[in-house]
């Protein structure tokens, strides 16, 4: 009885195995079918031939070498740019801590920081324009005032950063390294700026404090 159509007969001899064909390269196959292929080259100046085709007017190897040199210069430029932003990031206190700051964040923070420092310098210049009584008082207590001003200057950056951390408190931990320090400790640090001022001297003698209170966000 013959097997049903489409069913292999187990008694039949196995079919002969076909050998693996040689590896074909598409470029070779296309060249055999269509003739010479267009030459791949880097961007360069081309000259139109009378036949209608185009031919390069430059040495291909020189074009590729110039391209490699240009790419190396661009990579070095990007590295220098990233190193510059990294140094600027380490100096600017106005940066979000809940996420990685972008280059735009770093530039905005640097702009705000420069503006605050500029306001402090302007306030220091205005403080020198005092009436004779105030000038006499300043001369009599210059040593204590200088010490207080230096202490205030050392704490400005810390207090600015702390105040901005309170503003974005809901976004995550700030520059305290994730220690979970309560927010009221940061507020106490900001308010302690006025504690370095001599009790016999009014707060308006230190325009830096007033300027700082206007520039910082309300917490």
Curated annotation (Swiss-Prot):
Pfam families: HLH. It comes from the Eukaryota. Residues 124-151 are annotated as: Disordered. One of its GO terms (biological process) is regulation of transcription by RNA polymerase II. Germ cells. Expressed in the fetal ovary, but not by a range of other tissues. Expression increases across mid-gestation, rising some 40-fold by the time of primordial follicle formation. Its main location: nucleus. It is found in: Nucleus. Residues 136-148 have a biased composition (Low complexity). Residues 65-117 form the bHLH domain. Gene3D superfamilies: Helix-loop-helix DNA-binding domain (4.10.280.10). The keyword Nucleotidyltransferase does not apply. InterPro entries: bHLH_dom, E-box_TF_Regulators, HLH_DNA-bd_sf. GO terms for cellular component: chromatin; nucleus; transcription regulator complex. Keywords: Developmental protein, Differentiation, DNA-binding, Nucleus, Oogenesis, Premature ovarian failure, Transcription, Transcription regulation. One of its GO terms (molecular function) is RNA polymerase II transcription regulatory region sequence-specific DNA binding. Coiled coil: none annotated. Germline specific transcription factor implicated in postnatal oocyte-specific gene expression. Plays a key regulatory role in the expression of multiple oocyte-specific genes, including those that initiate folliculogenesis and those that encode the zona pellucida (ZP1, ZP2 and ZP3) required for fertilization and early embryonic survival. Essential for oocytes to survive and form primordial follicles. The persistence of FIGLA in adult females suggests that it may regulate additional pathways that are essential for normal ovarian development. Heterodimer with TCF3/isoform E12. It is linked to Premature ovarian failure 6: An ovarian disorder defined as the cessation of ovarian function under the age of 40 years. It is characterized by oligomenorrhea or amenorrhea, in the presence of elevated levels of serum gonadotropins and low estradiol. This is Factor in the germline alpha. The lineage of its organism: Eukaryota, Metazoa, Chordata, Craniata, Vertebrata.
């Amino acid at each position: 009885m013959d097997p049903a159509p489409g069913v292999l007969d187990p008694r039949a001899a196995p079919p002969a195995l076909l050998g693996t064909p040689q590896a074909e390269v598409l470029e070779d196959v296309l060249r055999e079918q269509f003739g010479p292929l267009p030459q791949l080259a880097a961007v360069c100046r081309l000259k139109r031939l009378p036949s209608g085709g185009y031919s390069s007017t430059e040495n291909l190897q020189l074009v590729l070498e110039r391209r490699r040199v240009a790419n190396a210069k661009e990579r070095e430029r990007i590295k220098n740019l990233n190193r510059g932003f990294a140094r600027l990031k380490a100096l600017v206190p106005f940066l979000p801590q809940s996420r990685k700051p972008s280059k735009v964040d770093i530039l905005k923070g640097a702009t705000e920081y420069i503006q605050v420092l500029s306001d402090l310098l302007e306030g220091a210049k205005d403080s020198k324009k005092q009436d004779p009584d105030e000038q006499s008082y300043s001369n009599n207590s210059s040593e204590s005032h200088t010490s207080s001003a230096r202490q205030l200057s050392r704490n400005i950056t810390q207090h600015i950063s702390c105040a901005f951390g309170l503003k974005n408190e809901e976004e995550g931990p700030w520059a305290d390294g994730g220690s979970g320090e309560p927010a009221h400790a940061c507020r106490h640090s900001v308010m302690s700026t006025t504690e370095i001022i001599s009790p016999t001297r009014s707060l308006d003698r230190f325009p830096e404090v007033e300027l700082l209170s206007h520039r910082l966000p309300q917490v």
